[in-house]
């Protein structure tokens, strides 16, 4: 990869600015010894990543930033208004993962159904204050896993059908052999 010096006339966009702020917050947590977190959270291989959709939430629980991918996920669950400046609860969005991350001061990964037949996987990482035990906010990464869960259910249904056919063929063969 190439590293270039920033152009003097170039102003960063909102996405770049927010990601840089999040990076700076994580570096201050690392310097204070508060990141990475001591406990591991489940299987992180399928957990949302920063490119899936990002929502930053401040210490008061108000949405401060929503990335374009997160905005698309919110639209799929029926939230069409601009969420910036409101709480997730006011929007009718499940805010349990955020509350759990703040209460435990540890990352939380939760999958839940939101709206009509939409399944979201959320990873909420508390942004700890490097100077004290407070929480400055939460970084919520979300992924729409509706299609993946639909395929899982379809696979389970096909598996049950194959088991039933196998059972019937086995019974027929036993009848013929006796």
Where are these regions (language model features)?
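PAS and related sensory helical modules
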Residues: 71-89
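Sensory coupling linkers of modular signal transduction proteins
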Residues: 2-40, 127-168
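Sensory modules in modular signal-transduction proteins
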Residues: 31-65, 70
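PAS-family sensory/regulatory modules and their coupling/dimerization elements
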Residues: 1-3, 87, 93-147
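Short acidic (Asp/Glu) and glycine-rich catalytic loops that position anionic groups and cofactors
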Residues: 82, 143, 178
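N-terminal functional module detector in eukaryotic proteins
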Residues: 5, 59-62, 80-85
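Short post-phosphohistidine helix in the DHp/HisKA domain of histidine kinases
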Residues: 169-177
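Signal-transmission coiled-coils
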Residues: 51-53, 57, 155, 163, ...
